[in-house]
């Protein structure tokens, strides 16, 4: 008999950002029971777990709101001890601002954080020493709205999605420089294959999420990292925003869907979709409906479970990736219009 996708998860924890809370909450990965929460600075966005130092990093991007519609950019990273559920330190990156995307090279002890442009510098990636928790470098991306980042397994190259800019920045992390601009019609989530041969980019830029029939076709652009060029598109029905690659080679794509409001009113968020591709063959394997406005996706280390955080419905959806069946919905308490955002899966301590 095949084991349940939930089996063997005792002691594992899922951390979830409530952007409006503002909190980081912790859930038992075996049964989704809420274990507690931690109040943090407004407004937290993304999470990244460092398994070597057992620390959870959280970006604080805006004082309120979201990209291009906010109440001012923040400058902080929050460092959390997830086992004690306490804030260890607040790292201020000023004058850098709007930290958002996070990618960790745990072996080399480097954390990469996207930041937006200011009057005197373009957007970029700030390099943090994961041991000292201090900035040790900055790499310009050449774009204003650098927002998501993915690093290859070798820790040598990063790919940065730059929102409305018509390119993704390829960065040489050893030289600290841009090596290529990959042409795309704007970009959202980004991921890199395990062998580093391909990058995957959600495109086009989602803008207001309303889309348009005359715009570029939505989907995932497949980038040959050797030539820094798009070689294929994995089509989606609706705008693709978050991307995530599992340890088993599944490419998880969050599709944002909208609908007209009552009586022809303003466009509003409708239930979204998790679409799954085989990253190697590029075959579409299927999908499952999730909550409104999926913004972040992660998975369990064994690649059996997907977690989809949906901002507008303030829910996290747990999906069995073998059966593509929804197992549970976690309702994240939201104090405002926005809710669930950043996610991190925390395996139990050895």
Per-region residue spans from a language model:
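Predominantly soluble domains enriched in secretory-pathway, periplasmic, or organellar proteins
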Residues: 1-350
């Amino acid at each position: 008999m095949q084991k349940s996708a939930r089996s063997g998860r005792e002691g594992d924890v899922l951390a979830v950002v409530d952007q409006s809370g503002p909190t980081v909450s912790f859930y038992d990965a075996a049964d989704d029971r809420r274990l507690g929460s931690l109040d943090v600075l407004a407004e937290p966005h993304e999470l990244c777990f460092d398994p070597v130092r057992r620390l959870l990093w959280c970006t604080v991007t805006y004082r309120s709101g979201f990209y291009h519609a906010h109440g001012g950019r923040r400058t902080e990273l929050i460092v959390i001890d997830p086992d004690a559920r306490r804030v260890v330190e607040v790292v201020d990156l000023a004058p850098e601002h709007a930290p958002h995307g996070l990618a960790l090279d745990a072996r080399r002890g480097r954390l990469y954080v996207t930041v937006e442009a200011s009057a005197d510098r373009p957007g970029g990636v700030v390099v943090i020493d994961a041991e000292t928790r201090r900035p040790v470098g900055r790499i310009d991306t050449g774009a204003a709205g650098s927002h998501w980042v993915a690093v290859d397994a070798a820790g040598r190259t990063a790919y940065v999605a730059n929102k409305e800019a018509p390119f993704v920045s390829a960065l040489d992390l050893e030289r600290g420089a841009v090596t290529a601009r990959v042409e795309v019609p704007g970009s959202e989530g980004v991921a890199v294959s395990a062998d580093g041969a391909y990058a995957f980019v959600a495109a086009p830029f989602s803008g207001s999420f309303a889309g348009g029939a005359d715009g570029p076709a939505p989907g995932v652009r497949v980038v040959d990292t050797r030539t820094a060029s798009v070689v294929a598109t994995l089509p989606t029905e609706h705008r693709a925003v978050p991307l995530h690659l599992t340890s088993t080679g599944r490419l998880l794509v969050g599709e944002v869907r909208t609908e007209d409001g009552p009586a022809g009113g303003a466009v509003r968020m409708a239930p979204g979709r998790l679409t799954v591709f085989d990253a190697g063959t590029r075959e579409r394997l299927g999908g499952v409906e999730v909550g409104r406005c999926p913004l972040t996706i992660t998975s369990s280390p064994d690649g059996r479970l997907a977690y989809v955080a949906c901002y507008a419905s303030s829910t996290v959806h747990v999906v069995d990736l073998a059966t593509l069946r929804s197992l549970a919905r976690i309702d994240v308490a939201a104090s405002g219009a926005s809710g669930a955002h950043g996610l991190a899966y925390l395996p139990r301590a050895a």
